[in-house]
Amino acid sequence: MTATMIGPALTLALSLVALTMPTSVWATGPTLTVSADGSVHIFDRDALLARTDVVEITTSRDVAYRTPRTYRAVALAKLLEGVAIPPDAVVEAVAQDGFVTQLPRDLVYANDGIVAYVAIEAADRPWPPIPAKDKSAGAFYIVWLGDQASSVPTMMWPYQIVSLSVQDAPAKRWPSLAVDPMLPALHPARDGQTVFVNKCFTCHTMNQAGSASAGPDLNLPMNPTEYFTDAGLRALIRDPRSVRVWPEQRMPSFAEEDLSDEELGLILAYLNHMSDRKSRATEGGSSKR
């Protein structure tokens, strides 16, 4: 190859590398990845803070800090402007520690007494560590404001988030989550499936279905109903430290306002039912038994 050809060839090669490398490689700080329908947008923290629609908000009920706090934030609906979200889809938020929560489309766009915001931690104004933890809730934290914000489950206040993506509803995305279709319409396991997705699916998988990695699968290789008594499992879910304690323990306790006794019973009904439906999930398709 002649010297005159090397220059243009090298330039082309470097350009191709730059196009295929994720934006986060070149970013100087934390980034938030937003993906939907095959398109990916990577937002740099400083770029987000420079947006004209950034506002200052104050929470009255803050799940991470347990006390009112003021943040600079952008409305989640504004961040998702131009993104097509089907009526039955969810916005999946993934955190650094493997925590994953599914935000229903109707909740994201509620705007009637409930508004979701992405709070942004500025480099020159760092947030304090979360109580009992050594890190803050940043750099990105989803918080809710409005008269009805207290009705949003604590599991839908994810902090330290790294990505948001539009996905099918969990049961459609992972059919192996579903209860037996022949179950009676009023069988408690049916409602239990919904509660499980809202409360447990953030950390656990079921039949290897799910995106979370913070906790173990709850059906493979064994379902907890197969080695816990009913009373023991209820105690573990309500307050894990009342059953066992170890230094790396991560599962939180659940107050009655976050998980009612009725909801706890529905989760157990679902787990009991699923213990006879062991399979390995195939995303978007049939399960493998």
Model-assigned labels for residue ranges:
Residues 1-13:
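Bacterial N-terminal signal peptides that target proteins for export
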Residues 28-167, 289:
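Structured, non-membrane catalytic/scaffold regions adjacent to prosthetic-group chemistry
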Residues 128-133, 137-179, 225, 232, ...:
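Periplasmic c-type cytochrome electron-transfer domains
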Residues 170-195:
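Electrostatic cytochrome c docking/interface patches
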Residues 192-207, 233, 251-252, 267-271:
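The canonical Cys-X-X-Cys-His
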Residues 205-238, 253:
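Gly/Gly-Pro-rich "capping" loops immediately C-terminal to redox-active cysteine motifs
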Residues 213-219, 239-288:
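Axial heme c-ligation environment in periplasmic c-type cytochrome domains
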